[in-house]
Amino acid sequence: RDGATTTITTRFPKDAVRRFAAMPDAADWIDRLTVVGIDLRDPTQVISLTEEVAAAGPLDILVNNACQTVRRSPGSYGPLVDGELAPLPTDLALPEMVTFDRISELHPASIAGTLREHPVAHHLGESPASMTALALSAGNASLEAHLAGTAVDAGGLLPDLQRVNSWTQKVEDVDPLELLEVQLCNSIAPFLLISRLRPAMRASAARRRYVVNVSAMEGQFSRRYKGAGHPHTNMAKAALNMLTRTSAEEMFETDRILMTAVDTGWITDERPHQDKLRIAAEGWHAPLDLVDGAARVYDPIVLGERGEDLYGCFVKDYRPSPW
């Protein structure tokens, strides 16, 4: 909407295409959008992506927004997987779509988890288009929708009915495969993207170039309280923060690239399903939404274009905060 030619990545490209095409103002910008289907847990796909992006010419902005916080059970992905098997609409203008291999298999080993051990969420009789519309509608994940069995979150995921997930697990409980997935998605993929796309950013004619690493409070060392849960997620975000702190000053001094780590704020609740229902019944919900989170991620770029150079810092609530 600000005039950029934009590439976005996702494991579910057809779902993304449907969402963007359904936007009321899509005709104004959809010809400048490319949707890339990729699994960022696969470093070979990440490297291939960097080669394609670099070959396309100079790059002004890189936002490392992908994240795996907890692994969900396969049933949560049901509508998204089904949507990848269904045809795209023919009555709307669609963005360009590029897809790498093996991005959203029905039950890939990396998300299969405990399929036989836990209830699997599902919606019967819903089309991909109707599921997309439901995910984009207000109240789609309300307590009432959960109790009625019709909840879908803004990412298109069904409620994960497992009573335990890695958000509450301690170091001896976290599955080794999930540990690896989280590191690959949250810190290894951003490292590869930054390192291999730096020449393309250096070639940009823009006054400033930007790298925004989407971080979280989980990776903050100076926080007064740090519980024992989800150590694998904490260490992944801490690694992303250290990458930012280590490389940002040199990247700015050498190439005028402004790199920051940004906390989106509390926009999701990762606790197990029954815990979420209990606190929702008590009136609690995440204080921010996806629009709030996106605004915080975009803000360092807006500031830079206004002449305020922000780099080498952890940004929370729109201002630098302690690491």
Q: Language-model segments: what does each one mean?
A:
Residues 194, 236:
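Active-site helix of classical SDR
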Residues 32, 251-264, 308-315:
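Conserved Rossmann-fold SDR core element
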Residues 14, 217-225, 248, 254-284:
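Flexible, glycine-rich beta-alpha linker
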Residues 64-65, 96, 161-163, 207-219, ...:
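Structural signature of the Rossmann-like NAD(P)-dependent dehydrogenase/reductase core
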Residues 198, 239, 244-253, 258:
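Catalytic Tyr-X3-Lys helix of short-chain dehydrogenase/reductase
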Residues 105, 110-137, 145-146, 277-323:
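C-terminal helical subdomain
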Residues 1-181:
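Short-chain dehydrogenase/reductase
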